[in-house]
Amino acid sequence: MSANQSPAGQPPTATYDSAFLKACRREPVPHTPVWFMRQAGRSLPEYLKVREGIPMLESCMRPELVAEITLQPVRRHGVDAAVYFSDIVVPLKAIGIDLDIKPGVGPVIAEPIRTRADLARLRDLTPEDVAYVTEAFGLLTRELGATPLIGFAGAPFTLASYLVEGGPSRNHEHTKALMYGDPQLWADLLDRLAGITAAFLKVQIEAGASAVQLFDSWVGALSPADYRRSVLPASRKVFEAVSGYGVPRIHFGVGTGELLGLLGEAGADVVGVDWRVPLDEAARRVGPGKALQGNLDPAVLFAGREAVETKTREVLDAATGLEGHVFNLGHGVLPTTDPDALTRLVEYVHTQTTR
């Protein structure tokens, strides 16, 4: 089923006619919808208050806290969609991988996965493993009403990079050594991770997600040839696994200007674009039949109001001929961003694009 169809035999949900979902389906919209990656996070004082003293992973497993954090930017900024508060390594933790999220570092894996014997530690994910996700989605969908809720997961390549490297990496040397040195083990690893990721997304969709985004944070480290050969099959498996639900599927990675066409080819309905490629050029690279999401440089929000509006206007102008456009930043909200600048940005985009 394509993103242009409501689920078979079911009436459209309360969110179906929202500007966000219409844009994802490449339908006419009353205004360009806006949401921000990492909109629920450290840029908000109310987030810092409720998270105080609570480790990141623990906060992702408390349904009422997750719901409150997810709702905060919707209340404050008036964004067109909420995005579920979690972390891409949550499903790995849920299946028993010994990991922690260290402040200022990111996910750290106690025992990296680098051999075939290590693969046995990656068991299947079940809904029972992440019951707190289902509970949080229930709380959120009741509270959000007609506002769409975006679910998300980490893409197989990025999860593999964390598992193989043992944490964040600048050069991904262990990851690439495995990918080039033992292609079969690499393929089996990504296939296993694709199954885990698909299961995690299915839990979110069945609990009420209106759309899902697959984050491939590190895949910009690869050439197009390496992506096509070593990553595309696993990402495609994820998208195919959730294709029957009728919810839009978004794909985003940082530094993926040379991979945009392949991100769409993997099965996305919407391709996220970082700030390095103008949206009109991105549309040429992606090809027809896809909506685009993006792509204001997050650092622009540290400039004055006039500069922000000028750069935003450039993004909107580049999006004029797109089949569908969801306004977003070209990456996540930076932690020290002034939240008032985000609120003004939402208002500006809405005002400038009202049909």
Curated annotation (Swiss-Prot):
Q: What is its EC number?
A: 4.1.1.37
| Keyword Lyase in annotation | yes
Q: Does the keyword Cytoplasm apply?
A: yes
Where it sits in the cell: the answer is: Cytoplasm
Q: Which reaction does it catalyse?
A: uroporphyrinogen III + 4 H(+) = coproporphyrinogen III + 4 CO2
The protein's UniProt keywords, in alphabetical order, are: Cytoplasm, Decarboxylase, Lyase, Porphyrin biosynthesis
Q: What is its main location?
A: cytoplasm
* The protein's annotated pathway: Porphyrin-containing compound metabolism; protoporphyrin-IX biosynthesis; coproporphyrinogen-III from 5-aminolevulinate: step 4/4
- Give the GO molecular function terms: uroporphyrinogen decarboxylase activity
**Residues given in the record as substrate binding sites:** 38-42, 87, 162, 217, 331
One GO BP annotation of this record:
heme biosynthetic process
Which InterPro entries is this protein grouped with? Answer: UROD/MetE-like_sf (IPR038071), Uroporphyrinogen_deCO2ase_HemE (IPR006361), Uroporphyrinogen_deCOase (IPR000257)
Site feature: Transition state stabilizer? 87
User: Which CDD domains does UniProt cross-reference here?
Assistant: URO-D
GO CC, sorted alphabetically, is: cytosol
Looking at the record's lineage, which domain of life comes first? Answer: Bacteria
- Describe, as the record does, how this protein assembles with itself and its partners: Homodimer.
Per the record, the similarity remark reads: Belongs to the uroporphyrinogen decarboxylase family.
Q: What does this protein do?
A: Catalyzes the decarboxylation of four acetate groups of uroporphyrinogen-III to yield coproporphyrinogen-III.
- Recorded protein name is Uroporphyrinogen decarboxylase
